């Protein structure tokens, strides 16, 4: 079985959903690796984070991911100055870990060639792509040029965005079945009128 060295799984986790957790659980059960590190994004250049602050996202990530096998959660991007470009994050991880494998989804792969300093990314890390049906990745230019850098893995886990969960929070809708129990117990005590711009009373 191929050994993946250090697996890196990043995301806003705003909040972490049950799909995030199931993806990490599936990968940790399926792949052989030395380290598996989950890291919440710090200051992403192309999106403005809303709702949960960095401390809360990090705390929730530790609560839900560190229950899975030997997963570690890193605050590496919160400690970086400036925008959290992937190549900068990989430079930081490379100081401590060898044989990096960055995990991305299919949507991210399809726009991967547009990422900042993509050549640096490919020099610093291999890429593990969670494959989704309906896409012919073998015809993409980035794959044809760098076949040895990519590993595609079937992803049987359903997808659910944090945006979907945040919209439910803003509308006062129950999120019980879309996040883990620990995440739900933590979030249900938040005043989402204040932090998410919620205009509706809770319906749960």
PLM feature spans:
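Nucleotidyltransferase catalytic core that binds NTPs
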Residues: 1-204
